[in-house]
């Protein structure tokens, strides 16, 4: 079976974890601030705050821009569900706006139209590693929180690296991401006060300079462990190479599949935008077999694929609790119904990519 994803891990990560275990300092040690500083420097941010997951990072970032009970946050319905869930954590309401059919990111015009007097923030998602049009969204007015969980290495058309613009930008390190710490995330920050607040809130509301077990604000256990930070430091050393390998694999896919009639491929880099390759997704032809049938048929051929991603507003919770219905976001619904992720990781060989593409063409009858 060709898997959907595989992390790049080796003896260096093993040695880094073993060194932490032998030190006896498994949490709140020296590796976390080192990882934060190196990661922030990599993306061009003033500060970094390491957290237990991308979801935790989104939650804290939304709190830091003032999202609270009864507020509205405009975001994309085409994302992993955590983007919307983090809004609901603060008893705010996710207000979805449709996506651009080419980039699959939040459409700035649709987002602007969704803003009301109750809108406290806009949360664009850099979907599949392609940079959202944050410069346009910044002009709409409300503060921006960037879901960059899939976008490490991405660059905006104006040359700014995703994470460097001063907005809270949240990265994630799940095993299928551009780099991994197993679980874990990091908030890139451009504001000194937000760094102080996030560092306290991830640690149960206790700032580093406070007395032991004194807490001056509501907080959470959103800490990253020393083992995760140690892995992250090694992964940062590998990152440029892993990003280059991912781009090479994506190029193979695009070259082989470019002539398949009706098959929509990821949009290429254009106008200065550079994708930080996270996954390679395609959209099944509209007159082809159902997406879920394609996934099953590919598995029968020894190839793992996944529906990627279902529309958030059509998930049971968001239908039942927030009242969303089919037909509200037609671009998202069309893309979500046809989109699948193909196997994608740095170690894929050209022969394996050819095998995947051949199987896909056979399954969709092209």
Where are these regions (language model features)?
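Phosphate-binding glycine-rich loop
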Residues: 25-72, 86-90, 96-98
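Conserved coil-to-alpha-helix start sites within the AMP-binding
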Residues: 79-84
């Amino acid at each position: 079976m060709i898997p959907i994803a595989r992390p790049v891990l080796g003896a260096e990560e093993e040695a880094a974890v073993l060194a932490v275990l032998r030190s006896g300092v498994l949490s709140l040690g020296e590796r976390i601030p080192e990882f934060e500083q190196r990661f922030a420097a990599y993306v061009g941010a003033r500060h970094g705050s390491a957290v237990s997951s991308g979801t935790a990072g989104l939650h804290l970032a939304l709190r830091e821009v003032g999202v609270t009970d009864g507020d509205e946050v405009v975001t994309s319905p085409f994302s992993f569900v955590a983007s919307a869930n983090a809004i609901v954590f603060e008893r705010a309401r996710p207000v979805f706006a449709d996506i651009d059919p080419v980039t699959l990111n939040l459409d700035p015009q649709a987002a602007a139209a969704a803003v009301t007097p109750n809108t406290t923030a806009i949360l664009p998602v850099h979907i599949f590693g392609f940079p959202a049009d944050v410069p346009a969204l910044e002009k709409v007015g409300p503060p921006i929180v960037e879901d960059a969980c899939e976008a490490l290495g991405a660059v905006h058309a104006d040359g700014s690296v995703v994470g460097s613009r001063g907005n809270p930008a949240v990265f994630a390190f799940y095993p299928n991401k551009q780099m991994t710490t197993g679980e874990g995330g990091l908030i890139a920050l451009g504001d000194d006060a937000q760094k102080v607040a996030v560092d306290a809130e991830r640690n149960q509301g206790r700032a580093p300079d406070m007395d032991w077990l004194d807490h001056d604000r509501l907080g959470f256990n959103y800490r990253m462990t020393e083992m995760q930070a140690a892995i992250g430091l090694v992964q940062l050393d590998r990152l440029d190479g892993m990003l280059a390998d991912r781009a090479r694999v994506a190029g193979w896919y695009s070259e082989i599949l470019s002539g398949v009639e009706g098959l929509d491929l990821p949009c290429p880099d254009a106008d200065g935008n550079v994708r930080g390759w996270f996954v390679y997704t395609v959209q099944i032809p509209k007159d082809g077999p159902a997406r879920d049938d394609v996934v099953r048929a590919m598995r029968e051929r020894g190839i793992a694929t996944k529906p990627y991603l279902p529309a958030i507003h059509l998930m049971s919770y968001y239908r039942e609790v927030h009242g969303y219905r089919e037909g509200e976001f037609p671009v998202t619904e069309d893309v979500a119904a046809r989109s699948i992720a193909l196997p994608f990781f740095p170690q894929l060989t050209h022969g394996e990519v050819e095998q995947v593409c051949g199987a896909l063409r056979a399954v969709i009858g092209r």
